[in-house]
């Protein structure tokens, strides 16, 4: 299960999920990717379930990159506890995902296999997802 080795603070504010993803919006490592279409928290358990679904479908073929990391702790109070008396205990870890973020990448398999593996992974996640391919820079050069 993914989680930070150590954190500076045990509890965090929930925060707002406004706007689109700043970085990580393109396929960089692999050939195909799974891109988020809306914002959500994705838990470390959901990330692991998606990873297992992909690797199981690809059977030993190909390579998978997980481009999100659950670095935000979320807290919960026990059931049937009255309001107040402090913030709850840390319950788990989440990755904040905004629209446009590429969450998983795959390489080393055909497009049909990658499409199906990423579709299976998308079913494990609480966000609407889109299959994306790597864009090759055609002829454009930034060098002077």
Swiss-Prot record:
Q: Which family is this protein grouped under?
A: Belongs to the universal ribosomal protein uL16 family.
* Task performed by this protein: Binds 23S rRNA and is also seen to make contacts with the A and possibly P site tRNAs.
Q: Subunit details for this protein? A: Part of the 50S ribosomal subunit.
Q: Does the keyword Transport apply?
A: no
Gene designation: rplP
* PROSITE patterns per the UniProt record, alphabetical: RIBOSOMAL_L16_1 (PS00586), RIBOSOMAL_L16_2 (PS00701)
According to UniProt, the name of this protein is: Large ribosomal subunit protein uL16
InterPro entries for this protein: Ribosomal_uL16, Ribosomal_uL16_bact-type, Ribosomal_uL16_CS, Ribosomal_uL16_dom, Ribosomal_uL16_sf
CDD domains linked: Ribosomal_L16_L10e (cd01433)
Q: Which GO terms describe its molecular function?
A: rRNA binding; structural constituent of ribosome; tRNA binding
One Gene Ontology term, aspect cellular component: cytosolic large ribosomal subunit
Please list which residues make up the signal peptide. Answer: none
């Amino acid at each position: 299960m993914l989680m930070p080795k150590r954190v500076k603070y045990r509890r965090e504010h929930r925060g707002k999920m406004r706007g689109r993803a700043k970085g990580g919006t393109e396929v960089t490592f692999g050939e195909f990717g799974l891109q988020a279409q809306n914002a959500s928290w994705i838990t470390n358990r959901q990330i692991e379930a998606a990873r297992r679904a992909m690797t199981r479908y690809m059977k030993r073929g190909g390579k998978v990159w997980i481009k999100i990391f659950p670095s935000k702790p979320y807290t919960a109070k026990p059931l049937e506890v009255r309001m107040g008396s402090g913030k709850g205990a840390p319950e788990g870890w989440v990755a904040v995902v905004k629209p446009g973020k590429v969450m998983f990448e795959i390489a080393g398999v055909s497009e049909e296999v990658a499409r199906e593996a990423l579709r299976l992974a998308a079913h494990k996640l609480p966000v609407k997802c889109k299959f994306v391919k790597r864009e090759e820079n055609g002829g454009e050069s930034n060098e002077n």
